[in-house]
Amino acid sequence: MLNVGCGRRYDRRWVNLDLASRDASVVQYDINKGIPFADGSFDAVYHSHVLEHLKPDQGERLLQECFRVLAPGGVLRIVVPDLETIARLYLQKHQQAWSGDEDAAVDYNWMKMELLDQLVRDQSGGRMGPYMASSAIQNSDFVRQRVGDEFSLCQATPEIETVRKPSLMLRFRAITRSFRERWARRCVRWLLGTKKAAALREGLFRGQGEIHRWMYDRYSLRHLCQEYGFEKFNVCTAFESRIEDYVQYQLDADQEAIRKPDSLFIECVKPISAVITKATPRTEPAENELLSAKVA
């Protein structure tokens, strides 16, 4: 079983892939280069909150690769933010706020951020991060219902933060990258002015993988999966799966708490009759297309 773009949520009984490895059980690899395993290697492939961070054509290539490395009859499980639910809640809160409901007006502001912020932000955390970290948040229960673990992490103090620190090598790379980018901005500012330097900073940020480049609902995701050969598409919950004993791995939920309640959970199957073929070779992606492990 393969977990693609696992981030900090993985099980050592799976094969785990991520752009940045913080553990020996995570293989460091850029999935924009494909998936580095032979055809038909896995009975299940899973990726959660990865697809929306890719451009549409990159997402299509990822699905092709998932199809390739799955054995016939294998299960693909995808988790993404649910555009349909976000849109419905946005319209519901909009109507209630328009009618004078002050509580709904607060929720409306959040739903507008949830819909747009990760698409348009130009700095880490955007508007959502500071909002969730605020001690004066008015609709904490609603926001917690929407984003789950992310809200708890934003509310946590440094003293109780339990997320594992990056390795020394990752920290060194981050410092080196920051140094290079800082000098690049200074050079651009000197040569082209402040506005061009600001454009460079924004471009560098948006290429790091935090932003969302596309959104999906059950209809568009079903169409996409069927286009690339999958069948038996179904929408499920965090606790339902064709993957044997899936719940025990706690990838989508801990006990009864769903990690990302704003998610759409789907599964589809590679047909038993599928003929395994090699994916079409392609050129190396530009550095700013690399998928970051940092997802929100």
Predicted feature residues:
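Short intrinsically disordered terminal tails
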Residues: 294-296
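Conserved SAM-binding loop
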Residues: 1-86, 219, 266-272
